[in-house]
From Swiss-Prot:
This is 2,3-bisphosphoglycerate-independent phosphoglycerate mutase. Catalyzes the interconversion of 2-phosphoglycerate and 3-phosphoglycerate. Its EC number is 5.4.2.12. NCBIfam families: pgm_bpd_ind. Pathway: Carbohydrate degradation; glycolysis; pyruvate from D-glyceraldehyde 3-phosphate: step 3/5. Keywords: Glycolysis, Isomerase, Manganese, Metal-binding. GO terms for cellular component: cytosol. It comes from Listeria welshimeri serovar 6b (strain ATCC 35897 / DSM 20650 / CCUG 15529 / CIP 8149 / NCTC 11857 / SLCC 5334 / V8).
Amino acid sequence: MSKSPVAIIILDGFGKRAETVGNAVAQANKPNFDRYWADFPHGELKAAGLDVGLPEGQMGNSEVGHTNIGAGRIVYQSLTRIDKAIEEGEFQENKALNNAFTHTKENNSDLHLFGLLSDGGVHSHINHLVALLETAKDKGVKNVYIHAFLDGRDVAPQSSLEYLETLQKAMNDLNYGEIATVSGRFYAMDRDKRWERVEKAYKAIVSAEGEKFEDPIELVKASYANDKNDEFVVPAIITKDGKPVATVKDNDAVIFFNFRPDRAIQLSNAFTDKEWDHFDRGANHPKNIKFVTMTLYNPSVDAEVAFEPIEMKNVIGEVLSNEGLSQLRIAETEKYPHVTFFMNGGRNEEFPGENRILINSPKVETYDLQPEMSAYEVTDALVEDIKNDKHDAIILNFANPDMVGHSGMLEPTIKAIEAVDENLGRVVDLILEKGGSAIIFADHGNSETMSTPEGKPHTAHTTVPVPVIVTKKGVKLREGGRLADVAPTMLDLLGVKKPAEMTGESLIQK
């Protein structure tokens, strides 16, 4: 039977900004997007800060964006939740955190804090690290060591010195805590199974393998001199009196303070997996450690969780399933968890009638080397699916504007957007031919801002609104929309009643 599918099409990191300088979105040749913008109802959506359950002024990100999109409501994000717990004193009494503290006291062992050292608020926040230091000291933990992962991606590429100084000041004020290792997130936070990267971070933390420095600041400066920005700092060891400050040993406790799971899973697995074959963990692999993660990273990570997920009922996938509608989720590796796990409110399993297609992302060092990524392959698979009348609803993500946008390089990002536009045309024209419709929009900004006002590369997400197009003639879109309104709009286009849990509203004016 012929289907007229309704699609959610996410152009990841494709923000809306009037200024064209350093704006890959504005500079790209994108005839298909421009044609849909001219022909169909369009507007903009808020995709940052309070509108997606983040603190005011906080840039949006893919995890948060897809969670809000799928939920059809504003979802209180981990960052906001943990901030609130610290403010209200719940953090200090958190069971999992206190279990880690107790473990070190019972075993006369050390506490190690792993995580991304920045205030980017995408994966972690430095304030949470400072709160952990204060709490551990308050609870009588003797020694605490920090294994700092440098950012340079959700914040400026060379900003780690200020975060190291902030951390140093907090430790000086408390007279407590030391930095033991430093590693760029490229190594410690890989998510693409490039185990040789994770191995470097792991071996620095466990076996003190790597270059040695007495001062983290010197380490970073040496890395800059070597043309390696924060993200790419090779895992290195901090020493005192010629010896490593600390390694993770038998009976120690670890708290991984990243709250976003995807880039914390692999390193956590390296510490917690009983069965392991990705690299040789060596004789120093620590036994009997208490491993605590800030949020639930993945069922594969054997750890206690400080902030368990809040279960969400009636997300888009569940509603479609309950209505007996078939649905497809499709993306390449980099954004596959977003259209599945995050879109389903933190649930790994498919709903009945939900199918998934994963297309592998290209194995290149950085995506500016292959700006088209796997957009053509994703589209080939989807076109085939639509032609065969497989699904009533489609959720598609094009990763390129975000993933290439993170390089801070304008030209490759323009190419990325042009590749996406070509494929967007193939998908949307086919959907229209089938009598279906698409909601085309972004989950957050990035590629519209490729340079800072000083002309330096800008690699982070932004707080700008994102464009939205609904490819249906004869309707009007209301103003003031946000990401939480996308799922209700999809249901509206499908003629399905919105459940009470979805507090977002359809963008289509009644």
